[in-house]
Design a protein with these regions (language model features):
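Alpha-helix boundary/capping segments in eukaryotic regulatory proteins
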Residues: 38-44, 58-65
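Amphipathic alpha-helical interface segments used for dimerization/assembly
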Residues: 32, 51-55, 70
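Structural register within alpha-helical repeat arrays
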Residues: 11, 46, 51-53
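N-terminal alpha-helical interaction modules that lie
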Residues: 1-36, 74-102
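Short alpha-helical basic/polar micro-motif
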Residues: 22, 52, 64
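Start-of-helix signal in alpha-solenoid helical-repeat scaffolds, especially tetratricopeptide repeats
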Residues: 2-5, 40, 45-48
Length: 102
């Protein structure tokens, strides 16, 4: 499925905008489990999950965990950029990184 068409995906992004990172993570994990192995949708969802988790760890003042998780998010973003350089997925990830990267 195309992520942007899923109401659950929009719910997760709404949670993110309002600082409900755990809830966002839970919704995205359910989506992630239903994406095709090694697909751009799977990488994109996993990347956003890492952003949510990093923001949660940041709120919890767990600096080392935040840095480690952001490193993983950055690696996934780079992989999306390599595999789908002109994609909507990459554009959306870049927008989220501008708002939520730590």
């Amino acid at each position: 499925p195309i992520l942007q068409t899923l109401s659950a995906f929009h719910t997760a992004l709404n949670f993110m905008q309002h600082g409900f990172h755990w809830e966002e993570h839970e919704v995205l994990e359910a989506i992630w489990m239903n994406t095709a192995q090694n697909s751009i949708e799977r990488l994109c969802t996993q990347c956003i999950i890492h952003l949510a988790n990093a923001n949660l760890k940041h709120i919890m003042k767990r600096k080392t965990a935040t840095q480690k998780i952001m490193k993983n998010a950055n690696a996934l973003s780079a992989e999306i950029g390599r595999r789908a350089p002109n994609s909507v997925a990459l554009t959306e990830i870049q927008k989220l990184f501008l708002k939520y990267a730590l």
